[in-house]
Amino acid sequence: MLTITAIKAFNDNYIWVLQQQPHTQVYVVDPGDASVVIDYLEANQLTLAGILLTHHHNDHTGGVAELQAYSQNRLTVYGPDNEKIEGITHPLNATAQPRFILDYMSGELQVLDVPGHTAGHIAYVIADALFCGDTLFSAGCGRLFEGTPAQMLNSLQQLAQLPADTRVYCAHEYTLSNLKFALAVNPNNRALQDYNERAVALRRQDKATIPSTIALERAINPFLRASDTEIVDSIKQHFSDLNHANLDELGGFTLLRQWKDNF
């Protein structure tokens, strides 16, 4: 059985730990902070087998060097082949090698190209779990630091096509702030209203809202629903000074991301 555990880091990061029972060797996804990972490993008598990186930002990669030094064995470090990240031992290209096997894990690991937040951002799928870094958040998506709106929209559409029961393990607890924006642009979405109530209750108890699911995100995430009638109307009203005669899905998505950036 694959177990996935969250380690909290910094203000709102999640470092995900993957363990295939009964093995005591584990993998971590995007370890920005080595100290919390080491504490978790030692508290649970686990050995770090490898690291999975989604993109180059320091809050996702900052712990790699220390974890390599800490490990008694040479760590296998996977990451995108077209981003400059120190410590990667196995650069990945989703086109050349879309699937491979991890030691101590059952089943294949799938690699997806999801540029937008950064130019070389990748995501991983194993079993029914998606590790999407800063591409897809619950009720939101990542800022476009390097990629284009077209790239991000394509990446999100690719993720939205995964099976509905796929669990979404993003890298940040941004859900409540994302929901405020989602409700502003899609206020009459009952599924969104219900999810907001559940998420608020979870956070009041200091519980994670992650993982989400692809089914839930399809229903409530405005960035997966940029062509929804109410969302389009909200975009047109917010950007009332623009000519929306030929507003297509990409144009709507671009304006939606711009709106969120300044929300």
Curated annotation (Swiss-Prot):
Q: Which cofactor does it need?
A: Zn(2+)
Pfam families the record matches:
HAGH_C, Lactamase_B
Question: Which superkingdom is the protein from?
Answer: Bacteria
Residues recorded as binding Zn(2+) 2, renumbered to this chain, are D59, H60, D134, H172
Q: Which UniProt keywords apply?
A: Hydrolase, Metal-binding, Zinc
Pathway it works in: Secondary metabolite metabolism; methylglyoxal degradation; (R)-lactate from methylglyoxal: step 2/2
Please give the SMART domains that the UniProt record associates with this protein: Lactamase_B
Task: Write out the residues that bind Zn(2+) 1.
Answer: H55, H57, H117, D134
Q: What is its EC number?
A: 3.1.2.6
Q: Which reaction does it catalyse?
A: an S-(2-hydroxyacyl)glutathione + H2O = a 2-hydroxy carboxylate + glutathione + H(+)
Give, as one word, the top-level EC class: hydrolase
Q: Which GO molecular function entries does the Swiss-Prot or TrEMBL record give? A: hydroxyacylglutathione hydrolase activity; metal ion binding
Q: How and how many cofactors are bound, per the record note? A: Binds 2 Zn(2+) ions per subunit.
What biological-process GO terms show up in the record? methylglyoxal catabolic process to D-lactate via S-lactoyl-glutathione
Family assignment from sequence similarity = Belongs to the metallo-beta-lactamase superfamily. Glyoxalase II family.
Q: HAMAP family, per this entry?
A: Glyoxalase_2
Q: What binding partners and quaternary form does the record give?
A: Monomer.
State what this protein does.
Thiolesterase that catalyzes the hydrolysis of S-D-lactoyl-glutathione to form glutathione and D-lactic acid.
For this entry, the protein name equals Hydroxyacylglutathione hydrolase
Record organism: Shewanella baltica (strain OS155 / ATCC BAA-1091)
